[in-house]
């Protein structure tokens, strides 16, 4: 399956990660508001409701209680488009106020950063005002990130992961890698590394 197709769809990404036994947050898919509410209560509050497609944390909401969940599900149910009728519900992972973005090129990690949420938000996207800090690549992070990248088809990818009591969990893999936040804190020249990788692949 095409890498961009897999990475552009959280459902496909999750299915591949779980099949390959790459650690990922507990996720339940539902196709009606009623079954989605049951899924949320199975995972427990708080939980996270995400769109199947999209980036930058858009339409990703934290469901703190049943009342909030019912309101968000009702709103989603009124939106047009078949993809909005797929309810992608994920556990709210107990983690520090950050996640990890690793930039993977083939079989190695170019760089890794912590991404911290901006004040008043829990989402860590740099595009939403979050900020980055350098992250040491541990053996666990390297193993999980490279396995995740290989699972979706490999290449130049951004693997997003969280630290949890169960270890490193991959929650997203991006085939369009934004590295402005990483470039501002990492000593490595990420742009040059990416160019070198692309040229090397083009010569094959």
Predicted regions and their residues:
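Short, flexible active-site recognition loops that position polar ligands and cofactors
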Residues: 179-189
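Phosphate-binding site of ATP-dependent enzymes
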Residues: 58-149
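Rossmann-like NAD(P)H-binding beta-loop-alpha module
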Residues: 24-46
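A short acidic, helix-capping loop that chelates divalent metal ions and anchors anionic groups
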Residues: 56-59, 181-182
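Conserved N-proximal alpha/beta basic substrate-recognition cap immediately N-terminal to
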Residues: 1-26
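A short beta-strand motif that forms the metal-chelation/ATP-contact edge
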Residues: 102-104, 167-181
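Protein kinase-like catalytic core scaffold
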Residues: 47, 88, 110-111, 157, ...
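A long amphipathic alpha-helix within ATP-dependent nucleotide-binding catalytic cores
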Residues: 122-170, 193, 197-203
């Amino acid at each position: 399956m095409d890498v961009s197709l897999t990475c552009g769809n959280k459902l496909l990404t999750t299915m591949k990660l779980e099949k390959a036994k790459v650690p990922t947050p507990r996720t339940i898919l539902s196709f009606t508001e009623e079954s989605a509410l049951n899924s949320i209560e199975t995972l427990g509050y708080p939980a996270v409701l995400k769109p199947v497609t999209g980036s930058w944390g858009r339409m990703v909401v934290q469901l703190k209680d049943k009342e909030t969940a019912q309101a968000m599900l009702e709103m989603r149910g009124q939106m047009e488009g078949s993809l909005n009728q797929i309810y992608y519900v994920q556990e709210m992972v107990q983690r520090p106020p950050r996640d990890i973005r690793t930039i993977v090129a083939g079989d190695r990690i170019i760089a890794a950063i912590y991404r911290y949420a901006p004040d008043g938000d829990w989402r860590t996207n740099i595009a939403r005002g979050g900020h980055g800090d350098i992250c040491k690549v541990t053996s666990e992070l390297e193993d999980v990130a490279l396995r995740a990248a290989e699972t979706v088809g490999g290449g130049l990818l951004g693997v997003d992961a969280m630290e949890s009591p169960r270890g490193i969990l991959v929650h997203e893999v991006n085939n369009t890698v934004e590295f402005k936040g990483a470039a501002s804190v990492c000593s490595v020249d990420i742009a040059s590394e990416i160019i070198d990788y692309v040229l090397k692949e083009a010569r094959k």
